[in-house]
Amino acid sequence: MKKQQSSNESFDVIVIGGGHAGCEAAITTAKLGFSTALFTINLDRIAWQPCNPAVGGPAKSQLVHEVDALGGIIGKLADETAIQKRILNASRGPAVWALRAQTDKREYSKRMIEILQNTDNLSLKEAMITELLIKEVETFTKNSKNTTKQIKGVKTFFGTCYSAKSIIITAGTFLEGRIWIGNKSMSAGRSGEQAAQGLTESLHSLGIKTERLKTGTPARVDKKSISFDALDIQPSTASDKYFSFDPKIKNDMPQICCHITRTTQKTHELIRNNLHLTPIYGGFIDSKGPRYCPSIEDKIVKFADKNSHQIFLEPEGINTPEIYVQGFSTGLPENIQLELLRTLPGLNKCKMLRPAYAVEYEYIPATQLKLSLETIEIDNLFSAGQINGTTGYEEAAAQGLVAGINATRKLNMKDPIIFSRESSYIGTMINDLITRDLKEPYRVLTSRSEYRLTLRGDNADRRLTPLGFEIGLIDERRWFAHKEKMKLLKEENSRLENTRLKCTDEIARNIELESGSKIKGSTTLKDLLKRPNVHYSDFIKYDLANKSLPIAVMEGVEIDIKYEGYLKRQQNNIDQINRQSLKSLPIEINYDLIDTLSLEARENLNKIKPTNFGDASKIPGVSKADLTALLVWLKIKEIKKEKTNSFVEKKLSS
């Protein structure tokens, strides 16, 4: 039996886990003036990118912009360590434009460690936390006495105890983690690192349920063994674009190319012949994997009609030979993996440096959390990142920031910051996690948001930087830069609105010819910019623009003007939802009688009996569709009531 040893060290906040959620949480609480300790099993692997060495992509880039707008760190580091950047969905509308950066994973980790080491109020500690320590606190109301569980500290594997007022668990895939290659498995949080022991049992003993999920990562191959001449090149095309709104952020990393290959019929045949050797199809594990990042064997089985799948070869850094084979994760045995890789064009003589593997792990279903990411069961215990059932560094970082903010607000006896669906992708993600009983790893998608035109990456600072400044995470320098940008946006919008162009002007005739858009009489530059084939770049070309403006302001003005009508409609919808949140719900409603509600919504609404729509929207299991159905049901009831009253009045008057 391990002897318990009390440490004389105590902290306001302890963060368990040094991944992307843990780093954001620890930096946030420390920046806000609270003594913080970040505990991790391996101090050399902080903010590691164990899967894809990339940040951003559809919806994920919007999350990164939002974290940065609030004062978080992931966007800055992604910008500083990017070795390739691209804009995805560039041919589509601005609601789905997405910046994606290939990063140097070792440089990313190194710079994060430097930031942590130089952050005031923050201590780093290498230890495995195996137990949460709690105390029971009695609270009294007029009619009753209640006992609540409250966090008081942690215990390490070797028995040392540390006290803390608040704890944030960001354990990633490490809780009872087990990695699989074929039918062989071993205990590990990820390749080369031991799993976290004891903490799962501690959570169970405190009444917190965990379940199991799976994810995976592809093999890494030696770039010296690849025939790049046989491959399509994917160059860096957006090195001048940034996740961060901080004008000081720069990138001095060399920009390099990725490459594209494809699976072949031989690849597919080899996979089909060996499906029985994979952990999932062989029946060795039954945990659910991520729907939007399937293994190569899943792709071959589920899309059997496809003859080929695109595979991306992505460098893991400037000073490493490792190439990440994106889109080729697998659970097949190691010898078959190499055979598979060699069926890909350009890789017929490749050397595999690290095999692909699947990892299954315990997670906390987030229906056990509040919208602040505090656990319902235990006061001052928060949970963030992959342990909440998400997948992705971006989702983890956003949750870490939110948990850090709300842990400090709870200690300051302030109300939590609740991010709404209509205000941010952060709010969309957390709302989805809390209200849905998810059975597979969750990733953020633009399709998950009803307000994606409003929640663009380019306007994340306009939406969230005032809040970041109010909280205390945005400093005076950033705040001044933000206000200057807002001023420029307003002034340029006004200039375009008040500057007219006559159809007789030579510039007008040139724009007509190039855009195919007729100018009659005269028009303002603002109205001209609303036309689909006219862009701010045309104004620059014909000296109608303010060329001294930052690119972000030019782009922001054009998007605001082009989509003004859509944005107003979406804002009206948001305002309507906000008004509806105050709409009262009669306490006597029997939700079982409303068959348009989901079964889970009926059960939870009957149990909690919310008094208004705002409260109902925060109940786990009650989706936006449920709220809409409830609103329609109430409207029908009101109409029926009005008709009945009208009929009675007519009867009485006659």
Swiss-Prot record:
Cofactors demanded by this protein: FAD
Subcellular location: Cytoplasm
Positions bound to NAD(+): 289-303
Keywords recorded for this protein, A-Z: Cytoplasm, FAD, Flavoprotein, NAD, tRNA processing
Keyword Cytoplasm: yes
Domain of life: Bacteria
PANTHER family listed in its UniProt record: GLUCOSE INHIBITED DIVISION PROTEIN A (PTHR11806), PROTEIN MTO1 HOMOLOG, MITOCHONDRIAL (PTHR11806:SF0)
Function recorded in the entry: NAD-binding protein involved in the addition of a carboxymethylaminomethyl (cmnm) group at the wobble position (U34) of certain tRNAs, forming tRNA-cmnm(5)s(2)U34.
Designated name of the protein: tRNA uridine 5-carboxymethylaminomethyl modification enzyme MnmG
